[in-house]
Amino acid sequence: MDSPILRKAPIQILKENGIDYLYHITHKKNLKSILRFGLLSRNLCIEKGLAVEEIGDTEIKERRGMTMLPYSGLRLNDYVPLYFNPRNAMMYKVCKRFNANNLVVLAYDLMVILISGTIFTDANAASVDANFYYRKSELEKFDWKIIQSKDWSFGGITFREIKQKMMAEVLVKERIPRKYLKKLICNSLESVEDIKSLVKGKVEIEVSEGMFFY
């Protein structure tokens, strides 16, 4: 466990690499539950009988459900996943599948990384490329230039390493309390209108067309 004296250092590492928030992509239909209960892991949602509009690929969800994390004794689906860079291959897939108008990106305070038991990966946690890190100080080892890349394809060639590293994750055990949610990001004013009555001014809503794919 990192020394409490060093607790601010990991957040500084993120800020110095252009990361102001941690992100989770979800369907707008899930907002009501998230605003009420916080953001829950897939397994905790199942345990509590919460209806969830799933956006992830079934095969990948099953793989994450079987992936046991080193040392913790828990599986990936026992954790809530957040991205450092939300405009990644996962975002591309779900935008093509559901249309960006139906999606919302949740932006969380960086203080989330201080929640006990939080784990970090330097690539998509379900991929064979991922390394798992249990100390916040190890964020210094991450290749932030690649993680913060704008694209994973150049000249028609897809670079697998870049694609996977852009999906590096923060894994929070079971639940992220509502207090850490700082803003909701939609792709259009039309989408904002869809969720305004639900949010009731309790969370900032922002429009960012460039975060989504079309």
Predicted regions: what is each one?
Residues 1-81, 87-214:
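Active-site-proximal loop/hinge segments that shape catalytic or ion-binding/gating pockets
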